[in-house]
A protein has these predicted regions:
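Short, charged phosphate-coordinating catalytic segments
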Residues: 131-135, 208-232
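Active-site/catalytic core of tyrosine-dependent DNA strand-transfer enzymes
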Residues: 262-323
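Non-catalytic DNA-binding core/recognition domains of DNA-processing enzymes
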Residues: 42-136
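Catalytic-site neighborhood detector that most strongly recognizes the C-terminal catalytic loop/helix
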Residues: 361-390
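Basic, Lys/Arg- and aromatic-enriched nucleic-acid-binding interface segment
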Residues: 182-215
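Short, basic (Lys/Arg/His-rich) helix/loop patches that form interaction surfaces
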Residues: 190-191, 309-359, 363-367
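Flexible interdomain linker/hinge and immediately adjacent N-terminus
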Residues: 138-184, 296-298
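Conserved tyrosine-mediated DNA breakage-rejoining catalytic core shared by Y-recombinases
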Residues: 220-267
Length: 400
């Protein structure tokens, strides 16, 4: 079991922070944390970004520990990683460590974007470290040697890192949605959850489906964000919120916005708050919408990311139709259904559609993010158009 890990904590002013530590000694690693502070935190990056960068750097030092490499000493002597060591490092960045330490990683590798990010972060960190440790040796040859070393690492990044080259089937089809809400129906025989949490969990998926919310947006919702008279729900940004007890604070990455809610949905929210949430111990100490029900010291506290993912995992295992379920797939589903609804309304121009979609999803005006979420609909339209074109061809309907 490797002892290098990322530890997260919260300052008194509410700022979330993380650092790379040696679990055996409890000591933070000097250079990795200097890098995180000066190159990441001071650029005002979010805690989420800090954590993934720190995770990649901790992975690098786990590799060094495994290979018995003193990287500071090697750099000072200008004995950079040899080609075979770089190959070993690249292979190490491919491994999935989600299930434990060095001895417990999954055989399956991480996906290309994750590997690409890890290698890029490792290369950027090592370039910075070389400049720090060799600052006294500012000769042109030294700089060339360092950049050759860094470029040898960057060349190993996987190709085809196009963010638009994604699987078409990201959204759920009608059969999957029917299965999902049949399972989640409070009091239903198929419901895998205890009765006391069934309303809460059903509402979680209703909000994900109705608004295409991100997990951070969902877990960041407060009762005060809901206007029951106007039937609206506000999405608010609250980075480093001192009143949020969660160290891993759910963040809203998108723009703030106000969403209109159907009266039936507002009723479900109101019913949950008045007849369900209020019965839980400590629930009156804050107004975060979703809370922990499990008895113990965390009862009544805001629902954590880990609890949210556990809920999704239990639902995923409840039906073979939902084997690939993630909360984010409902965001793709919302976009697919939005595109179909727009197609039925011929009065809405493409420009207006883009504006409406961007607002409801919280994207900045002019963002090309919609291309990612709209791939399934575009694929179906292109398929329909191609088939109609071929049908005309076989009917002899094209002019010479």
């Amino acid at each position: 079991m490797c002892s290098i890990c990322v530890d997260s904590f919260m300052f008194e002013n509410g700022e979330r922070y993380c650092h790379v530590v040696n679990k055996d000694t409890g000591e933070p690693l000097y250079y990795p944390n200097l890098y995180i502070t000066t190159q990441v935190r001071n650029r005002s990056e979010s805690i989420s970004t800090m954590k993934v960068i720190a995770g990649s750097i901790s992975l690098l030092y786990r590799f060094f520990m495994r290979k018995n490499i003193n990287i500071d000493e090697r750099i000072q002597k200008k004995l950079f990683l040899a080609p075979h060591e770089i190959e070993d490092l690249i292979e190490f960045t491919s491994l999935n460590f989600r299930d434990g330490g060095d001895g417990n990683f999954r055989i399956l590798n991480v996906k290309k974007p994750t590997k690409y990010f890890r290698i890029t972060t490792v290369a950027n960190y090592l370039e910075w470290l070389c400049k720090i440790l060799l600052s006294h040796a500012g000769q042109e040859n030294t700089i060339k040697e360092v950049m050759a070393f860094i470029n040898n690492i960057k060349r190993k990044r996987p190709r085809n890192n196009d963010k638009y080259n994604m699987e078409i089937e990201k959204s759920l089809n009608k059969a999957q949605l029917d299965s999902l809400f049949s399972i989640l129906s409070p009091g239903g025989n198929l419901n895998p959850f205890k009765e006391k949490v069934q309303k809460r969990n059903n509402l979680i998926f209703l909000l994900l489906h109705c608004f295409g919310l991100r997990a951070g947006e969902l877990l960041n919702l407060r009762i005060g964000d809901i206007d029951f008279a106007e039937s609206t729900i506000a999405i608010r940004r609250r980075a480093n919120d001192k009143t949020d007890s969660r160290v891993y604070q759910p963040l809203v990455k998108t723009c703030e916005r106000k969403l209109i809610a159907d009266t039936k949905l507002i009723y479900e929210v109101s019913d949950y708050i008045l007849n369900d949430r209020r019965k839980i111990k400590n629930s009156n100490k804050h107004d975060f919408l979703f809370i922990t029900y499990k008895e113990g010291k965390t009862q009544g506290q805001p629902l954590s990311f880990s609890s949210y993912h556990k809920i999704v995992s239990i639902v995923r295992q409840s039906s073979s139709h939902l084997s690939g379920l993630t909360g984010h797939k409902l965001r793709h589903t919302w976009n697919y259904e939005f595109s179909k609804a727009i197609d039925k309304n011929q009065e809405i121009s493409d420009e207006k559609e883009q504006q409406i979609r961007s607002y409801l999803m919280g994207w900045r005006p002019g963002s090309d993010t919609s291309i990612i979420y709209n791939r399934r609909h575009i694929f179906e339209l292109s398929k329909k158009t191609a088939l109609e074109q071929q049908e005309q061809l076989f009917k002899g309907g094209f002019d010479e």
